[in-house]
A protein has these predicted regions:
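Mid-domain Rossmann-like dinucleotide-binding core that forms the NAD(H)/NADP(H) cofactor-binding site
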Residues: 48-123
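Short amphipathic alpha-helix with an adjacent loop that forms part of the alpha/beta core around
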Residues: 124-134
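Short helix-loop-beta connector
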Residues: 39-41, 64-70, 135
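Glycine-rich beta-strand-centered segment in the early N-terminal region that forms part
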Residues: 1-20
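C-terminal capping/lid region of NAD(P)-dependent oxidoreductase domains
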Residues: 221-228, 236-260
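Glycine-rich phosphate-binding loop and adjacent beta-alpha segment
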Residues: 147-222, 255-257
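A structural motif shared across PLP-dependent enzymes of the aminotransferase-like
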Residues: 17-31, 205
Length: 302
């Protein structure tokens, strides 16, 4: 059936929040009509989606970078960290990424333009930070917390800023709370700040941020990688990758194992069903003539 919502016409490409399910009833006011024509429509769930918005806000509005500053990001090969490093580079920072494999480190330096990538599983992190940032870290975009944050806090520059985006170390503790930093005094001695920020804080500003990110993406200066798993039944397999470090870039699940189209998440295209003025109903119906299949985002929003 066609949508009777006046805000949407048949064939619109839209993005919004839904459920990991064949059918979902969602508020249509939360859906945005997207510009079509990108070479990779998965970008709307990564570089141009919440990951991109989070990276931009954390770097530019919380971190407030200055040219020449040392910018460090953890989980640097993840969906948000990889974008944060690129945005910091555009702001003139010297960018150092933390990742857990040679493959990830090579991608950060060779493809994304990071100045340095540290394999924290192979190198002593404290020694590496002192080697690559002898004058200290000015901005630390933290996606992890835990022991990594402790080590970084011992290597801060004066007036350092720590945008706190995620707590991956906490998520892996199965409900147990991690202890706080044991060198909390460094915040005082270095006049440093830790600022937590979360996507609901800037959702209303998303379209403005997305317009800026879109220009960078189209000119080729903002890149991403999608790690796509096939089949809704494998959503937990994909979800697990985020916490075990098996993914590189954005973790996505393509609902249709038979689809030949590009995957774009929680997206309605021709062939899906929409009805009512206050809600959109999504279903796993694939129109083989459509250029896009239904996709869902597998993982935390940032």
């Amino acid at each position: 059936s066609k949508s009777s919502n006046p805000n949407f016409k048949e064939g619109d490409l839209v993005r919004g929040f839904g459920e990991w399910a064949d059918y979902a009833n969602v508020d249509s006011d939360s859906f945005l009509v997207l510009e079509e024509g990108l070479d990779h429509e998965e970008a709307y769930l990564s570089a141009l989606g919440l990951n991109g918005w989070t990276a931009y806000v954390g770097v530019m509005e919380v971190g407030k970078p200055k040219p020449g500053e040392n910018f460090l990001v953890s989980a640097a090969a993840g969906a948000t960290g990889s974008l944060a490093g690129q945005i910091a580079k555009k702001a003139g920072c010297r960018v150092i990424g933390l990742a857990g494999s040679k493959e990830k480190c090579d991608w950060l330096v060779d493809d994304l333009g990071f100045d340095v990538a540290i394999n924290y599983k192979e190198e002593n992190l404290d020694s590496a930070l002192k080697k690559y940032c002898p004058e200290g870290i000015d901005i630390y975009f933290d996606n992890v917390a835990g022991d990594v944050l402790n080590t970084v806090m011992a290597n801060l520059a004066l007036n350092a800023r720590i945008p706190l985006s995620g707590l991956l170390a906490q998520y892996n503790e199965k409900g147990a709370r991690l202890p706080g930093p044991d060198n909390f005094d460094q915040l005082l001695m270095k006049r440093a700040t830790i600022t937590g920020f979360f996507c609901p804080d800037f959702l209303e500003d998303g379209p403005r941020i997305e317009a800026l990110l879109s220009e960078w993406y189209k000119e080729g200066s903002l890149k991403f990688k999608a790690d796509v798993t096939i089949g809704l039944e494998n959503v937990l397999v994909a979800y697990k990758k985020i916490f075990t470090g098996e993914n590189i870039g954005k973790t996505l699940v393509n609902w249709n194992s038979t689809s030949s189209g590009v995957a774009v998440g929680l997206i309605l295209k021709s062939g899906t069903s929409a009805g009512g003025n206050t809600s959109i109903t999504t279903c796993r119906i694939y129109d083989p003539s459509a250029t896009v299949s239904n996709l869902i985002e597998a993982g935390v929003s940032n």
